[in-house]
Amino acid sequence: MANLRKTHPLLKIANDALVDLPTPTSISAWWNFGSLLGLCLVAQIITGLFLAMHYTADITTAFSSVAHICRDVNYGWLIRNLHANGASFFFICVYLHIGRGLYYGSYLYKETWNIGVILLLLVMMTAFVGYVLPWGQMSFWGATVITNLLSAVPYVGNMLVEWIWGGFSVDNATLTRFFAFHFLFPFLIAAFTIIHLLFLHETGSTNPVGLNSDADKIPFHPYFSYKDLLGFAILLIALISLSLFAPNLLGDPDNFTPANPLVTPPHIKPEWYFLFAYAILRSIPNKLGGVLALLASILILMLVPILHTSKQRSLTFRPFTQLLFWLLVADVIILTWIGGLPVEHPYVVIGQIASFLYFFLFLFLIPLSGWLENKALKWSCIDSSASERRSCKPDVGG
């Protein structure tokens, strides 16, 4: 009798995705972040569900209900700290996952990559509406500033903002709908994650050398399932350590003050994981231009597969593009630093230079370096009969 996991309609799906999945032997720890993101999502949904049982989405009691969770609910302080810091770890894993995709050419699986960019936008929206819920000063003013950006949309901008607010300012209606969105979006993210995996398993994973690995694959379980479990352990140890020893390290002190529409905080800034995009937004003195730059800073990822000029998939054997990749990483770190600083000289100029470099690297320098490396290698690639395979040989006497 055939094994049940291979014949049962439901178990067969799980088996093909988690047990008998053919996996390249050479994939490194950089391929762990997909499963770590799955762990983060599950942890966020579970902790969020328990928080939602005690939270009240009303401006008069929201702040008090969060205090009540931390003071009176059994282990409420731990659940709240795990949820708040879990968001930070979620974004750390997201950015490392995207970085790995850029470095190793995973973006050439266009459907998987584009679904991933949609997932990034959904995760960012979820984190933004979630940050508003404690109804502290930074929650209120962050919501006011960011939603106000939509007023830059021509003709319908003001109407759009009032529609999102549910009135003429950020008020009770805004908080209620943001709570509804924050509860809904994680399940939408879970659905898109399944689609993301569906497209990934159509092609299989890439590998560090960027070559076709059909001839050298092993089952996902037990080899990579145990490797993923090690990643789970490291992530959970780091998350629990941060939540227990320095739970407010990544938060904003202003959020310990209840929201007051009459007092503006001296520096309005989002959570650390949005600072790079916030710096790009602030670097353009025009409101509409800033909003477009903010959107472009994320949506530019969708252009990466189109702008791929190299005959090699991965950056493993492309030293010049490697240099530009790490320059991009440094640039994003600089943007994150600038996003948390006040709008004054010299930070404004540094932010503008870093923002220009961010787009210049994606749109011009990295595609140019791929083209130059092709010229340097003098490769002529001949398409084989299989469309996804390419046999490459150096030009002789060229």
Swiss-Prot record:
A ubiquinone binds at residue 201. Its cofactor is heme b. PROSITE patterns: CYTB_CTER (PS51003), CYTB_NTER (PS51002). SUPFAM superfamilies: a domain/subunit of cytochrome bc1 complex (Ubiquinol-cytochrome c reductase), Transmembrane di-heme cytochromes. GO terms for molecular function: metal ion binding; ubiquinol-cytochrome-c reductase activity. It is a multi-pass membrane protein. GO terms for cellular component: mitochondrial inner membrane; respiratory chain complex III. It is found in: Mitochondrion inner membrane. GO terms for biological process: mitochondrial electron transport, ubiquinol to cytochrome c. Pfam families: Cytochrom_B_C, Cytochrome_B. Keywords: Electron transport, Heme, Iron, Membrane, Metal-binding, Mitochondrion, Mitochondrion inner membrane, Respiratory chain, Transmembrane, Transmembrane helix, Transport, Ubiquinone. Binds 2 heme b groups non-covalently. Heme b b562 binds at residues 83, 182. Heme b b566 binds at residues 97, 196. The keyword tRNA-binding does not apply. PANTHER family: CYTOCHROME B. Component of the ubiquinol-cytochrome c reductase complex (complex III or cytochrome b-c1 complex) that is part of the mitochondrial respiratory chain. The b-c1 complex mediates electron transfer from ubiquinol to cytochrome c. Contributes to the generation of a proton gradient across the mitochondrial membrane that is then used for ATP synthesis. This is Cytochrome b. It comes from Channa asiatica.
